[in-house]
Amino acid sequence: MRSFTLLSFVSAALAARPFLNEPDTGIEEIFGDLPAGELPPLDRLVGLPDFDWAARHYLNASSYTFYRNGAAGEFSYRNNLEGFHRLRFRPRVMVDITKVESTMPTTILGHNFSAPFYISPCGRAGLGHADGELGLVGGAGQEGILYIPALRTTRSGEDIANARVDGQVTFQQVYLEHNDTATQEIFDRAKALGHKALVFTVDSAADGNRHRAARYGVGSADTALTYNTWEYYKHLQSMTDLPIIIKGVGTVEDAKLAVEHGAPGIILSNHGSRQLDSSPSGLEVALEIHEEAPEIFTQTEVFADGGVRYGADVLKLLALGVKAVGLGRPFMFANTYGAEGVARAAQLLKHEIAIDAANLGVADLKQINSSFVKLKYNGWYS
């Protein structure tokens, strides 16, 4: 039996208190009188949850719902957010942390980035801002972080590629049908546009059961069932020389299979909780791997996403062995301000990672490990 499971204390927490989409830290008191359809001043937003509040206040209901919605009763959406607060730190003191900011840069598949987080693939950025994905690639370029454009975007692939700053590295997310001709075209196009890797989303074999999205007419009309197998993945690897990261790993068993089939990287993810309610969060999967097969973190590059809103969330995933952390909704909400909003969100998260690491007693982000987190639930719900 596993010695630790996040599910046990998350379920208790959900029964103990109401869910807050973003915590009450005073933003309503400060900006509550702002007319609907207006954004608060960018420089007065102090954390990633503020961008969610701003986007909900600014966007029409259907556009906001497209970004916000989750599967079915959205219990996995809640779990993605709340699970981080159940995992406690073990802070160390009397440590020289004065150079921790200099340890922020990392590599992803050998490419250099300024921080251990990236912009996850999200579609239809044009619902938030007229520049669409240009704001995401622009903000990522300003801050030196990875951006992974979705396969289905508002702006063309050429527009996105042309908006990159000199030397900026991007990966391309893909959905694939069991059609070699169409797949080869997608692969060749991604390479021609200068993307350095492919991110193959495998956790959406069928359409998501999204009640909130259906009410606002922004659900998917796709009723097809997708053919994805490990044998097919091996075949895909023979069709391109770009590395193919697998996005959507939700168990230690599949993480092992990904390693066996030569995946250069895996993303622990439940698709932003938009596909299967009751699916585990990236954090829970990272914990499962840490318990049952920690060697995986050295056999392939492991990334994770889902519910990340704070620097502390990033640190918890890094402590378990995750190399870099993805964020989707926060950057989509930040993109309501365009590239400057995306850059501002990245700056805020970098600052939080640095000061939270310092307060945790982490002198070097490359050296953080599971001794900094308490892997046994202490019975508290908040």
Positions of the model-derived regions?
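Glycine-rich active-site/cofactor-binding loop and its immediate structural neighborhood
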Residues: 112-155
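Internal helix-turn-beta structural module
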Residues: 339-366, 373
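Alpha/beta enzyme core
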Residues: 138, 163-166, 178-304, 311-335, ...
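An N-cap/entry alpha-helix motif that binds or orients negatively charged groups
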Residues: 17-109, 219-220, 228, 368, ...
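Short, conserved beta-strand segments within well-ordered enzyme catalytic domains
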Residues: 88, 105-107, 116-120, 146-148, ...
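A gly/proline- and charged-residue-enriched helix-loop-helix capping module
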Residues: 142-181
